[in-house]
UniProtKB/Swiss-Prot annotation:
Optimum pH is 4.1. One of its GO terms (cellular component) is extracellular region. Keywords: Carbohydrate metabolism, Cell wall biogenesis/degradation, Disulfide bond, Glycoprotein, Glycosidase, Hydrolase, Polysaccharide degradation, Secreted, Signal. GO terms for molecular function: polygalacturonase activity; rhamnogalacturonan alpha-L-rhamnopyranosyl-(1->4)-alpha-D-galactopyranosyluronide lyase activity. PANTHER family: PECTIN LYASE SUPERFAMILY PROTEIN-RELATED, PTHR31736. SUPFAM superfamilies: Pectin lyase-like. This is Rhamnogalacturonase B. Its main location: secreted. The gene is rhgB. Pectinolytic enzymes consist of four classes of enzymes: pectine lyase, polygalacturonase, pectin methylesterase and rhamnogalacturonase. Hydrolyzes alpha-D-galacturonopyranosyl-(1,2)-alpha-L-rhamnopyranosyl linkages in the backbone of the hairy regions of pectins. Glycans are attached at N145, N239, N254, N321.
Length: 558
């Protein structure tokens, strides 16, 4: 239900310390949704919207935003809405978008169905954890059209969160974070078709925390593109997906301080793919920790000659200081696609690569291989030398399982994909994303009849788990799941004590944001990440849309 500004009280969230060294500062909105609603509430029904699944929501949503963009809450109540003209919501400050209804795509234009740009102190959420966008992408895909609209894109948004929201069956990408800063994404379910080009979450931004998200598709699960810095991605459930990755990378790559932690991958193309083909620049300071996989084609796949993208001019992207730690589980067929593949550019050999506590075994057959090229560091086929010169592919084959490879499975592992030419049902958001890990924030719908408010603090305070408010109740008590156990703390000028996350917490160091240079060409928006040709299109109003990746289309390796 709509936030009752008279009965719902905000609380000051005790946020985690910088959740890992990869976060450089606070994430999440600066004020709670209840505070914004108390300032002003703009209900789309008052602007001409109708929950009849046929009246266009586009104009009412834009009008409601215009009235609340300077401080307030835009409210889409429960019900079924049609969106035939896309909503470009630009220039908001201290505002929230509460979508408790389901928005169905009825238009056919390209671009982005909901595009939020140049905003600060922003929150998008569903108080029922059931709000959704249904892209009905199968209507495009049945005609072999893979370049329809994206569902949701944020561009140059600062101090924000998106949570308790569902994205289904996008004609193209589902969710893009483009040149954003200080954001938190959590408690989401994304379900797309079984085909390349239907990315789950793509991030090219600075100081972003993505956690507790499930993705089903056959391309990117949660992927970092360039330029990016200070990105923490954890508790991700790639449930019959393409898998998590980084790239594809081309010229002038600038990516650093990236952590993937607690990643569960089932029946996907890979557990982690770092991809490029030529190009220049660097990827450095990467931690890939606590991965569990079953039934995937590839496990660790670092490929600097990735054949699914056209070669880019340059000696190659320089990869360095990458740690792969605590990987368990099984791959589909290790004799055909081994669990360790580290192929670096001959013109830019990678170095300081560490693979430790890594135990994977094949589900089919009785052997598997490890393969390296121009790769230096420690573990498996990596060469240990200070002379980082190129060398040819070296492959070793083993015929006995490593000790300790056995790993648990998730009860919700899908038994089949959803295809790409029939309607995909809207899922519920799960309450478990990685075996044994409790989500950082309870679903708003499951908050024990409480209202979890966003942290209210100065920008210097570390924010996190920034759930706004759920059902109307006389008082608000934070759900126990929303605040991890305290281990150490940072005290801000507001004297807020910040417990750290339960896994691998450490104090983060503040670093400068990467430079996001505007490209030449139409419009003033930035150039998106460079990818293989296939699914990108020019966006709206002169926007230079990011180029999509073709991926391994329709491939299922199990």
């Amino acid at each position: 239900m709509l936030l009752d500004k008279l009965s719902v009280l905000s609380f000051l969230g005790l946020a985690p310390i910088f959740a890992a060294a990869q976060l450089s500062g606070s994430v999440g909105p600066l004020t709670s949704a209840s505070t914004k609603a108390a300032t002003k509430t703009c209900n789309v029904l008052d602007y001409g919207a109708k929950a009849d699944k046929s009246t266009d929501l586009g104009a009412p949503l834009a009008s409601a935003f215009a009235d609340c963009k300077s401080g307030g809450l835009v409210y889409v109540p429960s019900g079924d809405y049609a969106l035939s003209t896309w909503a470009r919501l630009s220039g908001g400050e201290a505002w929230a978008l509460q979508i408790d209804g389901i928005i169905y795509r009825t238009g056919t234009d390209g671009g982005n169905m909901i595009y939020i740009e140049h905003s600060s102190d922003f929150e998008l959420f569903s108080s029922t954890s059931e709000g959704a966008m249904q892209g009905l992408g199968y209507e495009f895909h049945a005609d072999d059209n893979w370049s329809g609209p994206r569902l949701l894109r944020l561009y140059e948004v600062t101090d924000f969160s998106v949570h308790d929201f569902i994205l289904v069956d996008s004609p193209s990408f589902h969710f893009s974070l483009d040149t954003c800063t200080n954001g938190e994404i959590y408690n989401m379910a994304i379900r797309g078709g079984n085909h390349g080009g239907l990315d789950g979450i793509d991030v090219w931004s600075n100081n972003i925390w993505v956690h507790d998200v499930e993705v089903t598709n056959k391309d990117e699960c949660v992927t970092v593109k360039g330029p990016s810095k200070n990105i923490l991605i954890e508790s991700i459930y790639c449930n019959w997906s393409g898998g998590c990755g980084m790239g594809s990378f081309g010229s002038d790559t600038n990516v650093s301080d990236i952590t993937y932690r607690n990643i569960y991958t089932w029946s996907s193309n890979n557990m982690m793919l770092i991809k490029s083909n030529g190009g220049s620049g660097f990827v450095e300071n990467v931690l890939l920790e606590n991965f569990i996989g079953h039934g995937n084609a590839y496990s660790l796949d670092i490929d600097s000659y990735w054949a699914s993208m056209s070669a880019v001019d340059g000696d190659g992207v320089q990869l360095s200081n990458i740690t792969v730690k605590n990987w368990k589980g099984t791959e589909a067929y290790g004799a055909e696609r081994g669990p360790v593949k580290v192929v670096c550019a001959d013109g830019a050999p990678c170095y300081d690569i560490t693979i430790e506590d890594f135990a994977m075994w094949t589900e089919e057959g009785d052997s598997q291989w490890y393969s390296c090229e121009s790769a230096y560091g420690s573990g498996y086929c990596l060469q240990d030398s200070d002379d980082h010169v190129s060398y040819s592919v070296t492959t070793s084959t083993v015929s006995s399982a490593p000790s300790g490879y056995s790993a648990t499975s998730m009860a919700a592992d899908l038994t089949t994909d959803f295809g790409s030419t029939v309607s995909i049902p809207i899922p519920t958001i799960p309450t478990s994303f990685y075996p044994g890990a409790t989500p950082y924030s309870a679903l708003m719908a499951n908050s024990a009849s409480t209202a979890a408010a966003s942290s209210i603090a100065s920008h210097a305070t570390v924010h996190s788990s920034s759930a706004s408010v759920a059902a109307s109740v006389p008082s608000a008590v934070a759900p126990s799941e929303s605040i991890p156990a305290a281990t150490s703390a940072v005290v801000s000028s507001a004297a807020a004590i910040a417990p750290s996350p339960a896994v691998g917490a450490q104090e983060g160091s503040t670093t400068s944001a990467p430079s996001f240079a505007a490209p030449s060409g139409a419009g003033n928006s930035p150039q998106g990440p460079t990818g293989a040709s296939g699914f990108g299109e020019k966006g709206q109003q002169g926007e230079q849309g990011e180029q999509g990746e073709q991926g391994e289309q329709g491939v299922c390796y199990v």
